[in-house]
Amino acid sequence: MGYDVHCYCFQDSPRRAHSIAAQGGINAAKNYRNDGDSVFRLFMDTQKGGDFRAREANVYRLAECSTGIIDQAVAQGVPFAREYGGMLANRSFGGVLVQRTFYCRGETGQQLLLGANSSLAEQISNGAVKMHTRAEVMDFVVADGRTRGIVYRDLVTGEVRSEAADAVVLATGGYSNVYFLSTNAKGCNVTAIWRAYRRGAAMANPNFVQIHPTCIPAAGDHQAKLT
């Protein structure tokens, strides 16, 4: 596309992202089961699952894009489970009314991450992306209300450097470790998001963070923290 893209990764490889721990699958309104599924039905299921607290426009857009995401993942080589006839398999997952979950056994997140990483590696090989591993973003360069670069630390040498940019995209994932109990990796914290917020980035609904049922104690001193 003509862009000079630099990717900065806190870990020693993008494959260390916590997405590798996801298991269940992805919901998409492809209606392979011919059971009346549609974008609107996926939208309504998602809204109900969120107790109607989610922003409707965003959820509807998510439902619209769901089928394309599956196609993209397949093109990246993600080995979704298939029926004997070769069609992608579906199962019911997460309280939905129809079978619309696409999955890779119990390792969907790992396979999606491998597919995305393979595409990234291809772009790196083509010279379209330059990868910087073991680099922690310390601050953002802001000029005239727009982000124009980053300040980062090389975690191997300890050297602090800066990089100018026309645009900065944060892809830090969740930050479930702001809660007392979490099954997420310790790197899933609010550090990068807080640094962007401190520099003026807009932030909304910080309470919408997934808490895995594994971390809900039956009783004890910390139960009130999860209500």
Show the residue positions of the predicted features.
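Rossmann-like flavin
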Residues: 46-93
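Residue-level detector of functional hotspots within protein domains
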Residues: 11-12, 64, 74, 87, ...
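Residues forming the flavin
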Residues: 1-42, 82, 105-227
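Terminal amphipathic helices with adjacent charged low-complexity linkers/tails
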Residues: 81-113
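Short, charged low-complexity intrinsically disordered segments located at boundaries
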Residues: 58, 71-77, 99-104, 146-149, ...
